[in-house]
């Protein structure tokens, strides 16, 4: 399909309508107010940083050297937050489903963090820290 063309039939398909009609459970014990940040693993740190800075306009806010984290870590922002995206290098080759290092969500209180943690455990989500 040519770039800039919208697939109207695809958007109106039963599968897409089902996704659009999906609602948030009313009994969630927390309320996510924002995606805080996303940390991605990359095979080519220089190329990845160049994409986020030169193409998307992000600004580098911090760099953790190899001595702090294998492969280095580069933090970047596009708003007033310290970082919205961070990259972790040191991956030899792309691995299916291993590019996402972690992501963070913001909630309104520490109590909600603890409730979210328990909720995620009940749903068999592995929490590493």
Show the residue positions of the predicted features.
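Core segments of cupin and vicinal oxygen chelate
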Residues: 29-30, 40-84
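A short linear hydrophobic-aromatic micro-motif
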Residues: 60-62, 86, 125-129
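Short, solvent-exposed loop/turn segments at the edges of secondary structure
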Residues: 82, 98-100
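Vicinal oxygen chelate
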Residues: 2, 18, 42-46, 104-129
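A short, acidic/glycine-rich surface segment
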Residues: 21-23, 84-88
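Short glycine/serine/proline-enriched coil/turn segments at secondary-structure junctions
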Residues: 66-68, 94-97
